[in-house]
Amino acid sequence: MRTASITRNTSETAIAVELNLDGTGAYSVATGIGFLDHMLEQLSRHSLIDLTVKIDGDLHIDQHHTTEDSGIAIGEALAKALGDKKGITRYGHAYAPMDETLTRVALDISGRPWTVWKVDLKGPRLGEWDTELIEHWFQSFAQAAGITLHVENLYGTNQHHIVESCYKGLARALRTAVEIDPRKADSIPSTKGML
């Protein structure tokens, strides 16, 4: 099975993540930030990646460390579960509509982390979550996972819808990219022979 467990303890956060790439989208998420929980639940449900996340963070200071470290730990778990990446589809993309909003996400499980973020969030918060941290979550996740990630909100007005479409787009793109291609189940999807 393609699974991973990550424990990450710093002076700022204590995190435990469990991940199953071949799951059904089952989740148990408790970060201490309600809107982040909601987004990680969407990520799990729509990627079909089972995800358990438990964080005890320094929220009495602010939400930065919890947000950043959750992205890092989930990214590390994804990379660990992928192992040598034999047989994966590697690339994934999705258009995620939500009411008046449409977002495009494309990714490559390349081993070359990069994030392009073209999302304009106008307000300072969603629920209690600082919106400036949302881009940082995606960057932290992509860096730790070793993926090239492009997220572009094409249009939309409701911030909740915009952010949720970003996470759902990521989920659907991951669902495709981590799938095993039975025609190449024993080979690395690269002419270099490694990712």
Swiss-Prot record:
It is found in: Cytoplasm. It comes from the Bacteria. This is Imidazoleglycerol-phosphate dehydratase. Pathway: Amino-acid biosynthesis; L-histidine biosynthesis; L-histidine from 5-phospho-alpha-D-ribose 1-diphosphate: step 6/9. It holds the Pfam family IGPD. Its EC number is 4.2.1.19. One of its GO terms (molecular function) is imidazoleglycerol-phosphate dehydratase activity. It catalyses: D-erythro-1-(imidazol-4-yl)glycerol 3-phosphate = 3-(imidazol-4-yl)-2-oxopropyl phosphate + H2O. The keyword Cytoplasm applies. Gene3D superfamilies: Imidazole glycerol phosphate dehydratase, domain 1. Keywords: Amino-acid biosynthesis, Cytoplasm, Histidine biosynthesis, Lyase. One of its GO terms (biological process) is L-histidine biosynthetic process. It comes from Rhizorhabdus wittichii (strain DSM 6014 / CCUG 31198 / JCM 15750 / NBRC 105917 / EY 4224 / RW1). Belongs to the imidazoleglycerol-phosphate dehydratase family. Disulfide bonds: none annotated. GO terms for cellular component: cytoplasm. SUPFAM superfamilies: Ribosomal protein S5 domain 2-like.
